Amino acid sequence: MNTDNPKSHISRIAYPAIIVFLILTLLGSLVERFHPFTSWLTPPVALLMGLAYALIFGSTHRRANKLGSKVLLQYSVVGLGFGMNLGESLASGRDGMMFTIISVFGTLLLGWFIGRKILQMNRNTSALISAGTAICGGSAIAAVGPILKAEEHEMSVALGTVFLLNAVALFIFPSIGHWLALDQQQFGTWAAIAIHDTSSVVGAGSAYGEEALRVATTIKLTRALWIVPLTLVFSFVYKTKGAKRFPVPLFILFFIGAIILNTYLLEAYFPEVGRFVASLARKGLTLSLFFIGASLTKEVIASVGVRALLQGLFLWILISVGSLAFILLI
């Protein structure tokens, strides 16, 4: 960070001040009498605040943004498990399994055709965007990148494409859901299938309702487990060796453990504890979206490029419309 730039001096004050303000507002929202003053701070608003900060001040506090957007998000997702019941979650995951299988393989095939045959993109960038769209955004890209031996700029382009579309999805999906009068189950399923990254899926579900949040989170994290077979498929198709590990996101296992603990212990003996932890986790999720927005600088947006954005956009539209039509027809 350039200390001679006046913006850098302002950002050193503004950044922690904004975070403290957000934390106090979110904690205040846990108290019922403060709701009229705190209800405005929703996940989309937090993301928008982060975007505004990034566009004004640029790339500052990268370490804090990375910790907030990844670690805080993962802790928050685990915390959401303390508000879920195992039987209901298994039912949601089972209901969404067919959508998941069709959409994962369909997205990978469409991504290959659009990226390589129509847009004539290089192999790695096209494959990374397809993987990020098919599974769970940045996590899938990070898992597949080493297998493809992708260059740093190829990873950056794919991540930038996915993050930009995620930001858009967080704003427009709840509005479309209300316009189409989707119920909580329908919207949660649609968000989990059509939105790439876990953060935006959970954010959109939270904005739509508690049941939509539960359904979306369960289906999305079930979908995220496809990272393991995805890495195996990519290793076979692209004939690459030397991938040291097939990353199973550890927070997903903790999320499952939280659901089990809540179902068999907290719901029976300490129901208030589970509800409080889940409520606190939703606040943490909202805060993590500020960090994600603050990471989307002008440089990230500029790095994407037209063809990468077109592949991501075409895939996203096809998957969104196709999955929505399927949900409405069944």
UniProtKB/Swiss-Prot annotation:
* Annotated InterPro entries: UPF0324_pro
Q: What is the protein's membrane topology class?
A: Multi-pass membrane protein
Instruction: Output the Gene Ontology cellular-component terms.
Output: plasma membrane
Q: Which domain of life is it from?
A: Bacteria
Q: Does the keyword Transmembrane apply?
A: yes
Q: Give the UniProt keywords, A-Z.
A: Cell membrane, Membrane, Transmembrane, Transmembrane helix
Recorded coiled-coil stretches: none
**Localisation per UniProt entry:** Cell membrane
Residues in the signal sequence: none
Q: Where are its TM segments located? A: 13-31, 36-58, 71-93, 97-114, 126-148, 158-180, 248-270, 285-307, 312-329
The record's comment on protein family reads:
Belongs to the UPF0324 family.
Q: What is this protein called?
A: UPF0324 membrane protein PG_2004
